Amino acid sequence: MAWTPPLLVLTLCTGSVISSGPTQVPAVSVALGQMARITCQGDSMEGSYEHWYQQKPGQAPVLVIYDSSDRPSRIPERFSGSKSGNTTTLTITGAQAEDEADYYYQLIDNHATQ
């Protein structure tokens, strides 16, 4: 019997304050140590803020990426974010067991808050 590496299941949920919500893949499975990519497509606009949060069962959400690609200092370097056109991507390079969680994408239209 061949050895199969354990899989992590990363679930994506979204939140948005714009009228047309983003679309996304509902779940991603990845083997330990492999790269995981979670993408969202939405009607982002200049001046909007895009954030990614990680939430584990029974815990509060933790900001892992802000302004599309910036990472808080306490977040491991394996987490990164990127944006191309209207697609925003969260990448986990070398996924670890502790990365199994729900991931939330948030798009905030800065014009709506002024």
Curated annotation (Swiss-Prot):
Task: Extract the ranges annotated as region (Framework-3).
Answer: 70-105
**Where is the signal peptide, in residue numbers?**
1-19
Record region (Framework-2): 20-40, 50-66
Pfam families, from UniProt?
V-set
Q: Which keywords does this Swiss-Prot/TrEMBL entry list?
A: Adaptive immunity, Cell membrane, Glycoprotein, Immunity, Immunoglobulin, Immunoglobulin domain, Membrane, Secreted, Signal
UniProt-listed GO biological process terms: adaptive immune response; immune response
Please name the SUPFAM superfamilies in this protein's record.
Immunoglobulin
Instruction: State the disulfide connectivity.
Output: none
Describe, as the record does, how this protein assembles with itself and its partners. Answer: Most probably, the immunoglobulin is not assembled due to incorrect folding of light chain. Immunoglobulins are composed of two identical heavy chains and two identical light chains; disulfide-linked.
Q: What is this protein called?
A: Probable non-functional immunoglobulin lambda variable 3-32
- Record the organism: Homo sapiens
> What phylogenetic lineage does the species belong to?
Eukaryota, Metazoa, Chordata, Craniata, Vertebrata
Quote the gene name from the UniProt entry. IGLV3-32
